[in-house]
Regions:
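His/Asp/Glu-rich, glycine-adjacent segments
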Residues: 15-188
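Alpha-helix capping/hinge segments and adjacent helical runs
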Residues: 7-8, 12-17
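Acidic helix-start/capping segments at beta-turn-to-alpha-helix junctions
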Residues: 1-8, 83-86
Length: 188
């Protein structure tokens, strides 16, 4: 696997990209000569997002799909990830839902492939705790004082330790690539 999408598909399906049909996040459609996203699907619009998504390009089952089969459909399966491709490819075809953080709004979103509206608990989380509501006050800084002053490398560390605020139109994409997103995924 060469990127997040092909790695997610390989891990959850247990087979290489050759077999699961997910070679990367995007590939070139030979008929239209345009890039195609691995989970793009115009048949299934997004919920709380303008992005469309489904696992229909994934040609194999996932571990979650197999869990649904072996429990006669009784298993409850959700995939929660910062990124659309990781959530949808991890959820697979039979999941109860897949959730990711929307790049434009910073809210948790999903696809109509799984349901027509977010479950009430996800709607409540978006109202009370969505990344969009917290991102303005969020600053990433090194956890350890040693990391911020590099005292183990140099005799005197920098006077201004590194900090990063999430601002501007790319703030949600930046947040999704920071370590802080792990707590957000856990809380969701």
């Amino acid at each position: 696997p060469i990127d997040r999408a092909s790695a997610s598909a390989a891990i959850t399906s247990g087979v290489a990209p050759y077999y699961n049909n997910i070679a990367g996040q995007q590939w070139l459609n030979r008929e239209t000569l345009r890039p195609v996203g691995c989970v793009d699907d115009a048949k299934y619009s997004g919920i709380n997002t303008n992005e469309t998504a489904s696992p229909n390009k994934l040609s194999t089952s996932t571990i979650g799909d197999e869990l649904k089969v072996c429990t006669g459909g009784k298993a409850i399966e959700y995939a929660i990830a910062p990124f659309r491709d990781a959530a949808v490819l991890s959820a697979g075809h039979a999941a109860n839902g897949a959730f990711w953080i929307d790049d434009a709004s910073g809210n948790w979103c999903s696809s109509r492939f799984y349901f027509n509206a977010l479950p009430s608990w996800a709607q409540a989380y978006n109202r009370l705790n969505a990344p969009a509501a917290k991102i303005g006050q969020t600053t990433w800084e090194p956890y350890s004082i040693l990391a911020s002053n590099f005292s183990y490398f140099m005799q005197t560390g920098p006077q201004n330790p590194f900090k990063h605020k999430f601002t501007g139109p790319q703030r949600y994409q930046q947040f999704k690539t920071s370590g802080l997103v792990n707590a957000e995924v856990t809380n969701m």
